[in-house]
Amino acid sequence: MASIMMNKSVVLSKECAKPLATPKVTLNKRGFATTIATKNREMMVWQPFNNKMFETFSFLPPLTDEQISKQVDYILTNSWTPCLEFAASDQAYAGNENCIRMGPVASTYQDNRYWTMWKLPMFGCTDGSQVLSEIQACTKAFPDAYIRLVCFDANRQVQISGFLVHRPPSATDYRLPADRQV
């Protein structure tokens, strides 16, 4: 057995000993060096302006109703309690103006910002269509607000997940995935 392992390690080391190919470097119009990687948009700079993110899935394009429905089904399958929250555009992101600070330490809630709860948490909800109808009602009542769906685990007494289900049409702080890099 030891000799077989020894032979494999020798073979691996011979394969790894091959010299790496150096990338072809060319100069672009401005005189900067470019490689194949930069031409393929693999080495890009993150756009720091108007590119704010929220919780889970915020790096993706806005979720469709079907995708939200699948997430709701997953939440209900795991016996978690869904809850809708909404916030105005100026209160949606964490900041000194809208965070509750308790002395030198922050509160223990997720990211120190509290959104307004839409009705009560949906305790005992077993049908995903109920959650989707509440999302539609909240969107109709507050069309220019951010709306997120969070879910809580009653056994562990923690928030399990949270993601946006509605971004206001007037939001200018979001970029499509193709525009997030320079």
UniProtKB/Swiss-Prot annotation:
InterPro entries: RuBisCO_ssu (IPR024681), RuBisCO_ssu_dom (IPR000894), RuBisCO_ssu_sf (IPR036385)
Presequence range in chain numbering: 1-42
UniProt cross-references to Gene3D superfamilies, sorted A to Z: Ribulose bisphosphate carboxylase, small subunit
One CC-aspect GO term: chloroplast
Chief localisation class: plastid
Compartments where located: Plastid, Chloroplast
One Gene Ontology term of the molecular function aspect: monooxygenase activity
CDD domains linked: RuBisCO_small
Any one biological process term the GO annotation gives: reductive pentose-phosphate cycle
Keywords, in A-Z order: Calvin cycle, Carbon dioxide fixation, Chloroplast, Lyase, Monooxygenase, Oxidoreductase, Photorespiration, Photosynthesis, Plastid, Transit peptide
Record SUPFAM superfamilies: RuBisCO, small subunit
One Pfam family in the UniProt entry: RuBisCO_small
Domain of life: Eukaryota
Main function: RuBisCO catalyzes two reactions: the carboxylation of D-ribulose 1,5-bisphosphate, the primary event in carbon dioxide fixation, as well as the oxidative fragmentation of the pentose substrate. Both reactions occur simultaneously and in competition at the same active site. Although the small subunit is not catalytic it is essential for maximal activity.
Additional information: The basic functional RuBisCO is composed of a large chain homodimer in a 'head-to-tail' conformation. In form I RuBisCO this homodimer is arranged in a barrel-like tetramer with the small subunits forming a tetrameric 'cap' on each end of the 'barrel'.
Subunit structure of this chain's protein: Heterohexadecamer of 8 large and 8 small subunits.
Protein family membership: Belongs to the RuBisCO small chain family.
Name of the protein this chain belongs to: Ribulose bisphosphate carboxylase small subunit, chloroplastic 1
